[in-house]
Amino acid sequence: MPRVMINPATYENVRESVEKAFELFPLRIQGKRVLIKPNVLRATEAKEGIVTHPAVLRAVVEKVKSLEPARIVVGDNPGVFSYGANEESFKKTGLMEAAMGYYENIGNVSEKVDFNPDFMPAVSISRAVLDAEIIISLPKFKTHGLTIVTGGIKNSYGFLPGAQKARLHKAAGSPPRFHEAIVDVFRLRIPDLFILDAVVGMEGNGPASPDLRDIGLILASDNAVALDAVVAWMMGCDPGRLRFLQRANEMGLGDYEISRIDVIGELKRLPDFKLPPLGGEAVSGNKAAQEVIHSRTLLRPKADPELCTACGTCVDQCAVSALSMGDGNLPQVDADTCITCFCCQEICPEKAITLQ
């Protein structure tokens, strides 16, 4: 039975939760090469709640260092196209300092590996991921317009360097297929431990929403399917209806049934938790009915004129060139070209992209 730890925490005492996670899910780290991967969506201040908090990263780095590994690498691949934004993202978020000198730009060196031929015969993955003997994933408790939940499985999408993410988004072509692709990326190298920052979480139009939620928890597990199922349940979702969890379960990667997960700690739903708009992309019901309603319920990105600064970042980052600057210097979406990957929403520095 998979286990998930739920422990009360603040950013001031987070070391206690990290210690407990390592006690419950021990790793033989001495003499091993270790990769620690936080969730670094883009260059933003930690107080915005978009990335793994620096206090969590520092606590994990300190713990790993005390276990005498041969090597520590702290890294992620922020953004969709921007290889050059890697160092900037770590500096602005405070994660560079929290990495205690172990940061590396893991997007600089990549290697091609075999992939699901239904999407692409091969993908590029950061060499640091393949070289690591132990991988510790540090996801953030957040909503996501495409997957509902950003947790352990989705965090592994950052194993792909920027432009590779865009190519895979394009190859998937639709949200349901992208859910399959997310799991296939996760399977390339499944992390050994997940420590999820839920001290301050995100609700609403994630993964870059201004709606933060004080939750006061650290979650941990050695099974991402169980972890993400618990997160979904806390948000008020039925984990069994999330496409990516269904896919992961079908592939034998874990169980999403809460009754079959050993929860260590107090599991409670978050009252009145705001989920992102549901357009039929992330949740699954009757397959035939889903196909009929899919095009009618599909969410599209739209710029909020009160927040948009016409910086053009979303236009530049769109994997399929579905965005252009329209009247009034607001980005406009070509509905026929858009593949609803919502990368524009993720990357917008002003949080001006909403889903409608």
Regions found by a protein language model. Give the residues of each.
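Cysteine-cluster motifs in flexible loop/terminal segments that predominantly coordinate metals
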Residues: 310-314, 341-344
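Short Fe-S-cluster ligation motifs
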Residues: 338-355
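Short linker/helix segments within small regulatory modules
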Residues: 326-337, 341
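N-terminal and secondary-structure boundary signal
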Residues: 1-305, 309, 315-320, 324-330, ...
